């Protein structure tokens, strides 16, 4: 493991198998504060996602990287039937707590939350009688958490195949990643606001790129976040944590996605929620892939 020479995550965070980078609990707690609740989601993101799902008549949604549940909560509140899964039990506890606190609301009482692993997703999430979900979402740069341990991206292919298998015929997969093309060419993230959440706690984010055998192997982001009441006297304190990501470039990730559907899909790419054209002047922070199963 590269952890022996390069620390890829905060101390106490798991490094075996599909890594739970929030396993120490502290990173999960700080991340929950960092991204906030549904009110912290940007209006542009909320309008775009809800509009996309309703445009395609989606009702049953699988969130395969729900984390603390912020997107799933938004969808439940908007009337969607939601199944939420994540590999981190430390993150899921926030979603489970919200469901418990709102259990008297029929929509939240029906909200399904499970711990699941992308590598065994076809076993962890039973197929519905309808043959899959209307939409599967994997947003917030979540898929990039999965490393390439074997060096051949076989884990990525298996995970994407399992995720794609959850989509019914005619259904959607909505998945994103940061603009790693820009990060790898410049060494830093594109300038601009975060398109997903309005956090006022960030003090600094440092980007590092790990090169192995002349190939980009990992990107790490070191977050410095101001946490209310974390100081000894109750004043705001600073918390630091590191997360690592596999740097998926646009062209190669597009090939992986289309292979996951066996080529039987319609595929469009957006840059920060707007149609993306290679060579355009505006440099997006995120690439968002929307795939519609056609078989």
UniProtKB/Swiss-Prot annotation:
Disulfide bonds: none
Annotated keywords: Acetylation, Cytoplasm, Disease variant, Folate-binding, Methyltransferase, Phosphoprotein, S-adenosyl-L-methionine, Transferase
UniProt tissue specificity: Expressed only in liver, pancreas, and prostate.
Binding site for (6S)-5-methyl-5,6,7,8-tetrahydrofolate 1: 4, 6, 242
GO molecular function term, any single one: S-adenosyl-L-methionine binding
Subcellular location: Cytoplasm
N-acetylvaline carried by residues: 2
InterPro entries found in the cross-reference section: Gly/Sar_N_MeTrfase, Methyltransf_25, SAM-dependent_MTases_sf
Gene Ontology cellular component list: cytosol
Enzyme class: transferase
PTM-bearing positions, type Phosphotyrosine: 34
Pfam families tied to this protein: Methyltransf_25
GO biological process per UniProt: glycogen metabolic process; methionine metabolic process; methylation; one-carbon metabolic process; protein homotetramerization; regulation of gluconeogenesis; S-adenosylhomocysteine metabolic process; S-adenosylmethionine metabolic process
Stated regulation of activity: Inhibited by 5-methyltetrahydrofolate monoglutamate and by 5-methyltetrahydrofolate pentaglutamate, inhibition is much more effective by the pentaglutamate form than by the monoglutamate form. Two molecules of 5-methyltetrahydrofolate are bound per tetramer. The binding sites are localized between subunits. Inhibitor binding may preclude movements of the polypeptide chain that are necessary for enzyme activity.
Catalytic activity, reaction form: glycine + S-adenosyl-L-methionine = sarcosine + S-adenosyl-L-homocysteine + H(+)
Residues recorded with modification N6-succinyllysine: 46, 193, 198, 203
Positions that bind (6S)-5-methyl-5,6,7,8-tetrahydrofolate 2: 6, 217, 242
EC numbers on record: 2.1.1.20
SUPFAM superfamilies to which the protein is assigned, alphabetical: S-adenosyl-L-methionine-dependent methyltransferases
Positions that bind S-adenosyl-L-methionine: 22, 31, 34, 41, 65, 86-88, 117-118, 139-142, 178, 223
Modification Phosphoserine occurs at: 10
Cited function: Catalyzes the methylation of glycine by using S-adenosylmethionine (AdoMet) to form N-methylglycine (sarcosine) with the concomitant production of S-adenosylhomocysteine (AdoHcy), a reaction regulated by the binding of 5-methyltetrahydrofolate. Plays an important role in the regulation of methyl group metabolism by regulating the ratio between S-adenosyl-L-methionine and S-adenosyl-L-homocysteine.
Associated disorder: Glycine N-methyltransferase deficiency: The only clinical abnormalities in patients with this deficiency are mild hepatomegaly and chronic elevation of serum transaminases.
Family: Belongs to the class I-like SAM-binding methyltransferase superfamily. Glycine N-methyltransferase family.
Protein name: Glycine N-methyltransferase
């Amino acid at each position: 493991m590269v952890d022996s020479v390069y620390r890829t995550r905060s101390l106490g965070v798991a490094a075996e198998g599909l890594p739970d980078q929030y396993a120490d609990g502290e990173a999960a707690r700080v991340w929950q504060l960092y991204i906030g609740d549904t009110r912290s989601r940007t209006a542009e993101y909320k309008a775009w996602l809800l509009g996309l799902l309703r445009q395609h008549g989606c009702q049953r949604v699988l969130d395969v990287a729900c984390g603390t549940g912020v997107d799933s909560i938004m969808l439940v509140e908007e009337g969607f039937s939601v199944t939420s899964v994540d590999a981190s039990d430390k993150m899921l506890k926030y979603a489970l707590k919200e469901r418990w606190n709102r259990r008297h609301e029929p929509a939240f009482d029906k909200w399904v939350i499970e711990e699941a692993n992308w590598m065994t997703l076809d076993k962890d999430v039973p197929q519905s009688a309808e043959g899959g979900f209307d939409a599967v979402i994997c947003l917030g740069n979540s898929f990039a958490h999965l490393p390439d341990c074997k060096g051949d991206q076989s884990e990525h292919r298996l995970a994407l195949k399992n995720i794609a298998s959850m989509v019914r015929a005619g259904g959607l997969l909505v998945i994103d990643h940061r603009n790693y093309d820009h990060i790898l060419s410049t060494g830093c993230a594109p300038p601009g606001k975060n398109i997903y959440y309005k956090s006022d706690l960030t003090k600094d984010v440092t980007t590092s790129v790990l090169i192995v055998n002349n190939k980009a192997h990992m990107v790490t982001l070191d977050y410095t976040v101001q946490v209310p009441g974390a100081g000894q006297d109750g004043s705001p304190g600073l918390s630091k944590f590191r997360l690592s990501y596999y740097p998926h470039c646009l062209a190669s990730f597009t090939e992986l996605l289309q292979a996951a559907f066996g080529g039987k899909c319609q595929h469009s790419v957006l840059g920060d929620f707007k149609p993306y054209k290679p060579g355009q002047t505006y440099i997006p922070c995120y690439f968002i892939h929307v795939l519609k199963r056609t078989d």
